[in-house]
Amino acid sequence: MFLLYEYDIFWAFLIISSAIPVLAFLISGVLSPIRKGPEKLSSYESGIEPIGDAWLQFRIRYYMFALVFVVFDVETVFLYPWAMSFDVLGVSAFIEALIFVLILILGLVYAWRKGALEWS
């Protein structure tokens, strides 16, 4: 007898939800025709024949802007639930959120001073 009988539905759901994608990939692999040709090996750019080399070097500045964007995007994700329940949480949660924002502002000032936000 299974000791955690109340989890039977959970395990059944987990097994079924794991089996469905595996079966979908197996069935599509078995039923799909395999045709290799020059068109399958070429790059696809919105229906236009690609011109030039597909491998481009990106400047490191794009990386720095993306990194700063991700940091502040994650900040927004963390602050949104706090803002929705601001009136319930009280002063201690406000002080914690204020400390969180101040740490992120310090990080922004540091990145600014290091020149991470300058495009030159």
From Swiss-Prot:
One biological process term from GO is: photosynthesis, light reaction
- Reported EC number(s) for this entry are 7.1.1.-
**EC class:** translocase
Q: Which GO terms describe its molecular function?
A: NADH dehydrogenase (ubiquinone) activity; quinone binding
Provide the protein name: NAD(P)H-quinone oxidoreductase subunit 3, chloroplastic
Q: Which organism is it from?
A: Olimarabidopsis pumila
Which gene holds the coding sequence for this protein? ndhC
Among InterPro entries, the record links this protein to:
NAD(P)H_OxRDtase_bac/plastid, NADH_UbQ/plastoQ_OxRdtase_su3, NDAH_ubi_oxred_su3_sf
Q: Which residues cross the membrane?
A: 9-29, 64-84, 88-108
What is catalysed by this protein? a plastoquinone + NADH + (n+1) H(+)(in) = a plastoquinol + NAD(+) + n H(+)(out); a plastoquinone + NADPH + (n+1) H(+)(in) = a plastoquinol + NADP(+) + n H(+)(out)
Instruction: Tell whether Isomerase is among the UniProt keywords.
Output: no
Q: Which Gene3D superfamilies match?
A: NADH:ubiquinone/plastoquinone oxidoreductase, chain 3
The Swiss-Prot or TrEMBL record describes its family as follows: Belongs to the complex I subunit 3 family.
- Do you know which Pfam families this protein is assigned to? Oxidored_q4 (PF00507)
The GO cellular component terms are: chloroplast thylakoid membrane; NADH dehydrogenase complex
Chief subcellular location equals plastid
